[in-house]
């Protein structure tokens, strides 16, 4: 098979995510078409279209085996469609005119003309520019990783972080990177500076920052190794930041003075803002730093409240984790102190520009056990030069039976690691593919356990803990009285994102992959013996699942701006759409669920 040029591959990575997203969000309708002896096509058209042959539509070819995983009722697709199911070409049809198109901006402009809902032209233009940015950055990622060295169980963890070359598996902004006000524009050519960044050490007045934990003591060995001078006076603290972030630091922290910059001492992890220090420095922590860039869906500067989740876990919640679950302890942090002058949005926006978190590095612990640490999301992705996933390559998965056995082992261990805390204590960990790592024995290639990190997204059901005599302040990060909101986030991050990505990447959505997950879910929860577990089990396997609507969030300016609690009344789910629950695929209920999701009546 001929491999398309890098530019076409990059364009299609955005295009296939975009086309699936507008269909799954209900912005357009879809059906399957077949032309003569060709493979079937996905056809997207206006929701109001009531003819079998729409005059204006988008056609994209399906992968040969994808049709078995797409389900229709009343000539309309009602099930989830994934980017893995699509292949080139993409054709835009308008009456008798047809043209092929991969460029994301032009494709979105045509696609948005199919929307029946009104969206401001300026918003559509912003989305188109974001798609073009993601496309350009994807091309640069492919250029830098066109001939990657093979990864194996002896590869350091940071190289596995770099294996996520495709970014988010379903988000159309999967490689978006926008500098915010105060920073110079970020271009694709700047990507190497993100991957191997220059560290800047600044001295700031102690009164301008808020310190949690033994920050100065923990950082001191690194400062000594890098010959970073100590502060001249006791009223100052040296804080690391990214060189790219310096304009924002100087703008919002008037006392900040650059002490030293150091290059070639660290590599970024998948998040693009957390650093793994080079092994010769023997520094036992990762450093998570603010960067005033929108990466995928959010600006990655660290708000003061986002340092609190790790503190909450370190001080209290870790006691309720299963004993064999490892977690990256956030030992100390720094944030701006502007919020002490008033907890306003303006002050918080200033304070986030100097955020820094020191997080335990567990690679030495894993090496002592002869274990590899692999970021979970990388296993579902492919190298740029190989059609197989990393899971297939590293674990030697060649047959459906081998994939079944491996997936059972993986899912069983993972659910045992993350669900007990949710059932017993109401603690929901956002363990999607970027926030979870897999421990693998180098000798046997067996999965020995899991690791979780990044607790700014942790959710805690306060009433559950109160019943156990554990009191938390309702203003603590992630605390809520709405248990179903936690379950909804778990459904998205664990089942749709983490495990779902593996099922689709391995091609097991058509070969009992979801049956394996249902079976292991039952084994992990034991819903027949525990009423609390049964409630969660029934929620996870309800008829529909809450699908995250990234584009609708952007259109309603609801882009990751909801971090508060949902105390007494459920919020309007503007960012979610119910779809047939993929976990039910292949079950006795599946056909009934599809029938109930059939379009009731087309708009005129």
Curated annotation (Swiss-Prot):
Protein's pathway: Secondary metabolite biosynthesis
Per its UniProt entry, which superkingdom is the organism in? Answer: Eukaryota
The molecular function terms of the Gene Ontology recorded here are: acid-amino acid ligase activity
Q: List the disulfide bonds.
A: none
Q: Which reaction does it catalyse?
A: cyclo(L-arginyl-(Z)-dehydro-4-O-homoseryl-tyrosyl) + citrate + ATP = NK13650 B + AMP + diphosphate + H(+)
Known EC number: 6.-.-.-
Does this entry carry the keyword Cytoplasm? no
EC class, as a word, reads ligase
Keywords assigned:
Ligase
Q: What biological-process terms (Gene Ontology) are attached? A: siderophore biosynthetic process
Q: What does this protein do?
A: NRPS-independent siderophore synthetase-like protein; part of the ank cluster that mediates the biosynthesis of NK13650 C, a highly modified cyclo-arginine-tyrosine dipeptide. AnkE is responsible of the production of NK13650 B via ligation of citrate to the ankD product. Within the pathway, the cyclodipeptide synthase ankA acts as the scaffold-generating enzyme and is responsible for formation of the cyclo-Arg-Tyr diketopiperazine (cRY) from L-Arg and L-Tyr. The ankA product cRY is desaturated by the cytochrome P450 monooxygenase ankB to yield a dehydro-cyclodipeptide intermediate.
In Swiss-Prot or TrEMBL terms, this protein is called: NRPS-independent siderophore synthetase-like protein ankE
């Amino acid at each position: 098979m001929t491999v398309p040029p890098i530019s076409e591959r990059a364009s299609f990575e955005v295009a296939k995510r975009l086309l699936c997203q507008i269909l799954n969000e209900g912005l357009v309708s879809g059906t399957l078409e077949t032309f003569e002896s060709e493979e079937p096509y996905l056809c997207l058209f206006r929701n109001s279209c009531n003819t079998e042959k729409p005059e204006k539509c988008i056609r994209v070819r399906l992968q040969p085996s994808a049709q078995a995983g797409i389900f229709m009722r009343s000539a309309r697709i009602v099930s989830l469609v994934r980017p893995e199911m699509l292949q080139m070409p993409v054709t835009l049809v308008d009456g008798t005119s047809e043209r092929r198109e991969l460029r994301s901006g032009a494709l979105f402009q045509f696609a948005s003309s199919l929307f029946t809902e009104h969206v401001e032209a300026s918003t559509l233009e912003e989305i188109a520019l974001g798609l073009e940015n993601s496309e350009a950055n994807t091309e640069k990622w492919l250029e830098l990783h066109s001939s990657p060295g093979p990864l194996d169980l002896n590869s350091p963890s940071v190289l596995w972080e770099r294996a996520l070359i495709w970014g988010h598996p379903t988000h159309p902004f999967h490689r978006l990177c926008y500098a915010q006000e105060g920073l110079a524009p970020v271009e694709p050519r700047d990507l190497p500076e993100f991957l191997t960044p220059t560290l800047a050490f600044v001295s700031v007045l102690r009164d301008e920052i808020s310190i949690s934990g033994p920050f100065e003591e923990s950082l001191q060995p690194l400062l000594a190794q890098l010959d970073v001078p100590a502060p001249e006076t006791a009223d100052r603290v040296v804080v690391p930041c990214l060189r790219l972030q310096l304009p924002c630091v100087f703008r919002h922290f008037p006392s900040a003075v650059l002490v030293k910059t150091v290059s070639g001492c660290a590599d970024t992890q998948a998040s693009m803002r957390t650093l793994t220090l080079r092994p010769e420095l023997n520094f036992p922590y990762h450093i998570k730093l603010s960067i005033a860039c929108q990466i995928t869906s959010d600006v990655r500067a660290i708000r003061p409240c986002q340092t609190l989740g790790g503190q909450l876990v370190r001080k209290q919640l870790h006691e309720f984790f299963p004993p064999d679950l490892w977690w990256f302890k956030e030992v100390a942090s720094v944030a701006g102190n502007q919020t002490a002058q008033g907890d306003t949005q303006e002050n918080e926006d200033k304070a986030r520009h100097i955020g820094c978190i020191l997080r335990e590095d567990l690679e030495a612990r894993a090496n002592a056990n002869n274990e590899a640490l692999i970021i979970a999301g990388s296993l579902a992705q492919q190298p740029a030069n190989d059609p197989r996933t990393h899971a297939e390559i590293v674990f030697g998965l060649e047959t459906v039976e081998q994939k079944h056995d491996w997936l059972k082992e993986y899912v069983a261990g993972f659910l045992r690691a993350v669900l007990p805390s949710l059932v017993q204590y109401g603690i929901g960990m956002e363990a999607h593919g970027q926030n979870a790592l897999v421990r693998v024995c180098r000798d046997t290639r067996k999965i020995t356990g899991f690791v979780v990190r990044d607790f700014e997204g942790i959710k805690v059901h306060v009433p559950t803990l109160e019943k156990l005599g554990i009191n938390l302040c309702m203003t603590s990060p992630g605390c809520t009285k709405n248990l179903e909101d936690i379950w909804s986030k778990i459904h998205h991050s664990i089942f749709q994102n983490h495990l779902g990505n593996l099922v689709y990447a391995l091609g097991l959505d058509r070969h009992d992959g979801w049956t394996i997950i249902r079976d292991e879910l039952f084994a992990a929860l034991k819903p027949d013996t525990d009423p609390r577990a049964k409630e969660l089990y029934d929620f996870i396997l309800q008829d529909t699942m809450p699908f995250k609507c990234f584009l609708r969030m952007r259109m309603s300016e609801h882009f990751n701006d909801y971090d508060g609690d949902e105390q007494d009344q459920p919020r309007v789910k503007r960012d979610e759409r119910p779809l047939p629950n993929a976990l039910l695929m292949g079950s006795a209920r599946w056909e009934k669920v599809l029938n109930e999701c059939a379009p009731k009546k087309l708009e005129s």
